[in-house]
């Protein structure tokens, strides 16, 4: 389905992860480059651990709880990081990393064309290595606009720009309804997605405008390209809601992507347009 160069990917199995696993079973990426580390789950993430990860982007008054709506059986797909990377964290000491491979790879040196992990499991909605992270949130009174800051990073740059199948990041409120079409008619339907570029496309290596990908923005990470820091917004009502963040691969299980997420906030706005714009 992809170009032959896909075979160059370094695929890391569950038995060969380059991490240190402590008594709690939590993976920690070790690095002497800068202070901080990346702490990921041990594969079977509890609701308590998911909530800890979620609360890196907002406090307990906003993030009531969190869990996975879907996740692949292998790979450390979610992490809380105190390691400064690409301008994160934005506020507070930590931020969230979600991946469709292994979040612990984020600060590895970029020494090859690609580094990834086959996270396994069956296809979900036609996609592979699907991570769907669900947060139960509470919107304060008087606020009607949700803002979420993030940066999408990928190993698919530049080899797979303008390819039909790509990793993608999607953000939805209250329901997650995105779906993919099979090989032969490749497309993604995501009517509720509010993390889109200026043309309404999902965030991927093919995004345009403020959400376009280049190599410079991924400096200091294992990834070959990244977007600017973006702010995705959508209208919302006060009270309880669910926020779904999804990252997946539509075509293969090899070249992986991640999203750094921080600073979930709410404001009162006369106009609150769906979509992602530069936050730099």
Predicted regions and their residues:
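Secretory targeting and sorting signals
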Residues: 2-30
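Aromatic (Trp/Tyr/Phe) and Gly/Pro-enriched flexible surface segments
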Residues: 32-280
